[in-house]
Amino acid sequence: MTNPSGHNLPANSVAESYEGEFGCTLMDLRKLMELRAADAVTQISAHYGSVQEICARLKTSPVEGLSGNPADLEKRRLVFGKNMIPPKKPKTFLELVWEALQDVTLIILEIAAIISLVLSFYRPPGGENEICGHIVSNPEEDEEGETGWIEGAAILASVIIVVFVTAFNDWSKEKQFRGLQSRIELEQKFSIIRNGQLIQLPVAEIVVGDIAQVKYGDLLPADGILIQGNDLKIDESSLTGESDHVKKTLDKDPMLLSGTHVMEGSGRMVVTAVGINSQTGIIFTLLGANEEEDDEKKKKGKKQGVSENRNKAKTQDGVALEIQPLNSQEGLDSEEKEKKASKGPKKEKSVLQGKLTRLAVQIGKAGLIMSILTVLILILYFVVDNFVIQRRAWLPECTPVYIQYFVKFFIIGVTVLVVAVPEGLPLAVTISLAYSVKKMMKDNNLVRHLDACETMGNATAICSDKTGTLTMNRMTVVQAYIGGTHYRQIPKPDDLPPNVLDLIVNSICINSAYTSKILPPEKEGGLPRQVGNKTECGLLGFVTDLKQDYQAVRSEMPEEKLFKVYTFNSVRKSMSTVIRKPEGGFRVFSKGASEIMLRKCDRILNKEGGIVPFKTKDRDNMVRNVIEPMASEGLRTIGIAYRDFDGEEPSWENENEIFTGLVCIAVVGIEDPVRPEVPDAINKCKRAGITVRMVTGDNVNTARAIATKCGILTPGDDFLCLEGKEFNRLIRNEKGEVEQEKLDKVWPRLRVLARSSPTDKHTLVKGIIDSNIGEQRQVVAVTGDGTNDGPALKKADVGFAMGIAGTDVAKEASDIILTDDNFTSIVKAVMWGRNVYDSISKFLQFQLTVNVVAVIVAFSGACITQDSPLKAVQMLWVNLIMDTFASLALATEPPTDSLLRRRPYGRNKPLISRTMMKNILGHAVYQLGIVFLLVFAGDKLFDIDSGRKAPLNSPPSQHYTIVFNTFVLMQLFNEINSRKIHGEKNVFAGVYRNIIFCSVVLGTFFCQILIVEVGGKPFSCTNLTMEQWMWCLFIGIGELLWGQVISAIPTKSLKFLKEAGHGSDKEEISKDAEGLEEIDHAEMELRRGQILWVRGLNRIQTQIRVVKVFHSFRDVIHKSKNQVSIHSFMTQPEYAADDEMSQSFLNQEESPSLASKSRITKRLSDAETVSQNNTNNNAVDCHQVQIVASHPNSPLQSQETPV
């Protein structure tokens, strides 16, 4: 077998010399990992003997792991490679410059500027101006006339500056997004055993020979072989396309592959392949090679099928066969289909993007119409004036001069469009989001999808988990019911009969994940550290409080000796472990929710430690007198029980039979204190108009008590607290289908959903989002930590995954990761989201004022004076101010607490409120009045020569310089006004906290002074006197005074004002719209979202361009995810075989018949899961039962959530 790309294998002599020290080579391990199931078992047995022998050859211990010696680790990296997939090579700066030059508007400006430049050197024969009319400068100004080329050159220079600024911006943005991705990579760690210690190691540092601890919810970071496992089931659909979960056992299928998800159980594996040598890495390498070949073919203009490349890959080595499920179709047709499929089904845009798209299209249309009218009127004016009124003949020698005039008109028209179209919007969005994302990291929010940031600003509802989010996730047993006695404090060991104490200790120590541990405190006098499942840590702490050593018990009964483990899942809602008794027979330890466990018990231990009957009446009394009082104090109640099998070995698949007739040992009450900062955070949410709902698996009384402590419920409230069963009864019809009408009667009053499953959470979230009751449709945020929370996290407008307690599966489904698992971080995300929304609105208010004034001035000037008072280069400068600098200044305003004192904007509230419209029109009136006054009377007011109707190549005039200077200074001071959009009087509030804003305003003012005083002919400016400067400055400051006048006018009194920028319920872009350009969509995403701001949109195809900008920006961060480590590689949608299916399932509503079938499948799945084979991999073999399972991404699919 050959390596698909030569650089993949360490080929240097050092690596080769080290390779001999290990009992197997890199190629041996790669060949082994290509095998599956029985083939793999046979190969291991024939060539290595056993998995333990492989560990011996790799010089690692199955129990202790590697020693962690740096020299040994480096040797392994040399021989077997690093656990890293090389990122795609970034584009060079010159490539980015070339990309920026492709913009249609810039090309038009370049061509027009070049024509203007060439024609400016032409003079009509005879040297008399009258030949072609009064279109060139007077004879005495011939020297000045010789410099007519400067305007064309200045436009070219402006284009070059724009191109370089664009390229630099693109480069810096890509660098920033790569930095964000590397931060996400660093956050990804995996449990590795080194030197006998379980440590969390960054994924990139894993080497071949490491012993990895695998648990449910993990995304496997490398290939490996199972050493020991408990009920381990893997979702391999990302590699094989198989939706059914694969059970992994030592004797049937021990091969674990990178990029696959652990859906159930736990175990240990020895790492055998990492990085580009793992199965995922090999696929990545092959696909990358094909992409390069395709790119080369495109460059050469060849039109050959990609199937040829794939066939070559298959003949190169057998590894290519592993990726067949990813490419089931062949030939040209399949490639076309795959390209379309990779774009996925209709993508729903975020609320802000939808509103911006509609607004930008409207503005773009208006700008296009105005620019066309401007050019037509200028041409008509010129033609009528010269050839009709003055009756001149069109002379051949004057044609270049006329063309030069037409080019000038055309340039004016293009510059009107440059100013009119809001190409600064993408930059404002990008800067605001990038700034917010960077700052949100400090507030413990790791944003994975940029648009989730602004969506949080619209959130109207938050469905939060309880454990770890609202509470501290530090479990402590504070009460217990043992042997008929309710202990309000932890009992002393002497108070308990010896046999009862032994049963409590053994049941807790053995029947819990061996990864759950209590470690010494990091600081002297601190609390012991809890590692692993926090509920189990609380129980182990109870054992420690009873003065017992749980490690000693586990040493006597190591994990390898456990006969069988029934891991926790949402169907069982309990965990059980089977062990062999020394005297023969079996003992089953079981723990779970107290009500569920008590129903399975028919006997109980008494005070003396004897076993007595436990009748229904006794159970009811226990619930009433023990469990409910514990729950009302906010304690989680866990039941512990056991059962002995002394006779014939039972059928371990029949769980219903095994888990009946249990003996109740104890019921414990576990306290998980509410985080001290949570009540205040929930009060902030209430004040901000956000409803907080708690969704938990706990007892309804426990949930109600915690909700009251948090402030979700207050005494006297008329709100609902429901259990999952009651919730489903209320919302489903006789057929078991969810009815939206019924759900709409429940969710507005629902505040607590207890004893809920992940399916219930998904149903609730979907129901709230799909509901149409009320003025505004709901925007829902959801928190989740379990594998099963994936569907709800995907369905929610914003999904929050827990960074500490969350599984990899939950994190991959989320939009934002809470690095501290704290609810207050969600409130901070709301604040940042609203700040993004306000930043965009501030920028819009500013930009639309400039748009309205500049377009009307250019249009009116063209119609009346046959010239625009603002020249092309000046317009480009104004555009640079209002686009680049203004977006930088207004999009980086820090958030304030005042953002949380108003209600959410909602989905349908317009971007431009009536107050903003008042501000826009009010300031436009002031600016237009001043500009027109200066244009038509400025020469008299300042006693200077008029600049109106100047000849074609005349020198700059003081008159029009004052117009330009005043116009820019008015925009500068209006930028300060634009800091407030809700009618606030003090526009300077907090301005000194925003250093960027102050720097931009002062920097722009300084540049304006240089342009006027030094810019000269290229900027059509001439020097101004100090008095003229003072007047310009005074008029500019007048903007601030005028702003106070506008804010004093009540908005309600202006009935004629309309709102703008409304959002529809669901903004969608169809596949047809996506396919308008044949350029690779993934390549366009980063380019469009980041480049369009400076170089301008395509003014000819404004509508299409603007729609595509905001659509592609939704996924801009995905382009930046150059896979640094293998851990995140398989999360990329283009490599997920079932992506389209899963997305369509989540995004489209089910038809009643489909929903019914899904539920039938779910019931079958649940029923058969209970009876399936759960034998521990180290125990006796049993018959395997086929499971009828729904799709892994289905909302109805049930996986596990911790107790």
Curated annotation (Swiss-Prot):
Listed Basic and acidic residues bias regions: 334-349
Residues the record lists as binding Mg(2+): D785, D789
Domain of life: Eukaryota
Membrane topology recorded in Swiss-Prot or TrEMBL: Multi-pass membrane protein
Cellular component, GO, one term: intracellular membrane-bounded organelle
A Gene Ontology BP annotation from the UniProt entry: negative regulation of gene expression
Location of the protein in the cell: Cell membrane; Cell projection, Cilium, Flagellum membrane
The reaction(s) this protein catalyses: Ca(2+)(in) + ATP + H2O = Ca(2+)(out) + ADP + phosphate + H(+)
Keywords: ATP-binding, Calcium, Calcium transport, Calmodulin-binding, Cell membrane, Cell projection, Cilium, Flagellum, Ion transport, Magnesium, Membrane, Metal-binding, Nucleotide-binding, Phosphoprotein, Translocase, Transmembrane, Transmembrane helix, Transport
Activity control, per UniProt: Activated by calcium/calmodulin.
Region ranges (Disordered): 294-319, 330-349
Protein name: Plasma membrane calcium-transporting ATPase 4
Organism encoding this protein: Rattus norvegicus (Rat)
Gene: Atp2b4
